[in-house]
Amino acid sequence: MLDFAIFAVTFLLALVGAVLYLYPASRQASGIPGLTPTEEKDGNLPDIVNSGSLHEFLVNLHERYGPVVSFWFGRRLVVSLGTTDVLKQHFNPNKTSDPFETMLKSLLGYQSGGGSAGEDHVRRKLYGDAVTASLHSNFPLLLQLSEELLDKWLSYPETQHIPLSQHMLGFALKFVTRMVLGSTFEDEQEVIRFQKIHGTVWSEIGKGFLDGSLDKNTTRKKQYQEALMQLESTLKKIIKERKGGNFRQHTFIDSLTQGKLNEQQILEDCVVFSLASCIITARLCTWTIHFLTTTGEVQKKLCKEIDQVLGEGPITSEKIEQLSYCQQVLFETVRTAKLTPVSARLQDIEGKVGPFVIPKETLVLYALGVVLQDPSTWPLPHRFDPDRFADEPVMKVFSSLGFSGTWECPELRFAYMVTAVLVSVLLKRLRLLAVDRQVFEMKYELVTSAREEAWITVSKRH
């Protein structure tokens, strides 16, 4: 039932804000333990702001009231679920809708959810297959960009501090733009231009709608709208160029145009993937390398596996998939970093979790960041320990949360492969080292990032 988990995570804040406009307010009492509204108009929004983030607010709320808690966003009741047991109990029959797609497209001004359940299923399958096909076709490009970054880092003196987050975002943008859009983005200036547009749109989705600040700031709203129009215009132009064309490189757009989608549907899916995959991939690369710099034994063990599996021959996708310990490192990175800390779904009909009744049209949060740090499920939860994922029961829990296996979303599956390739290329030649006395704090937003730039150094292995 958690097939939507990762999708919904990345734009939870947008979902929270948008739902206020899509559904009438409800003050129905639920009997679920939690907070009463701090303010009549804003509900518990001031408490969320004072906590620093929605994730940190939910951590405190679940510690205080238990696994099932409630609070108010404006005049709307919100229920949060904070353990694997209560998540398993949550039932929502509307499995054909996807909160990520529905709410993101609503905020972007798109028409969503207009097809039948069968049509929606076919469209989502086409989307996932398009990601898989274009990633396979562009694997040589992924290797090329990874090796270019390796060469750049090899050229640095060992004392050079490398801005990790900046480099990972640039790397992710280069690959995603060329995989999605094609040869247009071989030009470095086009990538830089796209990065500016992408950054403006991403920074406002969720944040501005959560606190209402976007509507209150006409300058910001205008910049956001102009950036979105530029993004759409760029994508429309390339979609038109590639439709019916004969290109050497197969892209994400090419896969979509081969399906039975109209131009608007193709545009929507390109916008969604372009926005989400860049950030999720960049953050996963950043956190993975960061944790490798702070856990020397893990890095040594991963280097050993890479040397044994990849050898001196060419790196292939088949060999990357054989890196079982690397996969454990990536899973533990997602868990420890709480990469996507909150997911959400609208309760379509009245439901029940334990003794608690969840009213219809209640916004239900999945406090994944809380669940991923639950010591009853993850012993020593703050410790970075990839070996925990060698246990089958642990993998089943992780998969049930939507982070692997059947319910793993295309964007995360994409990010896993890209990160595995980059890390493999880097570790064949480099040791990744932490900068001494660096204070490293997490910033919990739609996707968890470092509050300040993450700095590392490198030295040659061979």
From Swiss-Prot:
<dbReference type="InterPro" id="IPR052666">
    <property type="entry name" value="CYP450_20A1-like"/>
</dbReference>
<keyword id="KW-1133">Transmembrane helix</keyword>
<keyword id="KW-0408">Iron</keyword>
<dbReference type="Pfam" id="PF00067">
    <property type="entry name" value="p450"/>
</dbReference>
<dbReference type="GO" id="GO:0016705">
    <property type="term" value="F:oxidoreductase activity, acting on paired donors, with incorporation or reduction of molecular oxygen"/>
</dbReference>
<dbReference type="InterPro" id="IPR001128">
    <property type="entry name" value="Cyt_P450"/>
</dbReference>
<keyword id="KW-0560">Oxidoreductase</keyword>
<keyword id="KW-0812">Transmembrane</keyword>
<keyword id="KW-0349">Heme</keyword>
<dbReference type="InterPro" id="IPR002401">
    <property type="entry name" value="Cyt_P450_E_grp-I"/>
</dbReference>
<dbReference type="GO" id="GO:0005506">
    <property type="term" value="F:iron ion binding"/>
</dbReference>
<feature type="transmembrane region" description="Helical">
    <location>
        <begin position="4"/>
        <end position="24"/>
    </location>
</feature>
<keyword id="KW-0479">Metal-binding</keyword>
<dbReference type="GO" id="GO:0020037">
    <property type="term" value="F:heme binding"/>
</dbReference>
<keyword id="KW-0472">Membrane</keyword>
<dbReference type="InterPro" id="IPR036396">
    <property type="entry name" value="Cyt_P450_sf"/>
</dbReference>
<comment type="similarity">
    <text>Belongs to the cytochrome P450 family.</text>
</comment>
<feature type="binding site" description="axial binding residue">
    <location>
        <position position="409"/>
    </location>
    <ligand>
        <name>heme</name>
    </ligand>
</feature>
<keyword id="KW-0503">Monooxygenase</keyword>
<dbReference type="GO" id="GO:0016020">
    <property type="term" value="C:membrane"/>
</dbReference>
<dbReference type="GO" id="GO:0004497">
    <property type="term" value="F:monooxygenase activity"/>
</dbReference>
<protein>
    <recommendedName>
        <fullName>Cytochrome P450 20A1</fullName>
        <ecNumber>1.14.-.-</ecNumber>
    </recommendedName>
</protein>
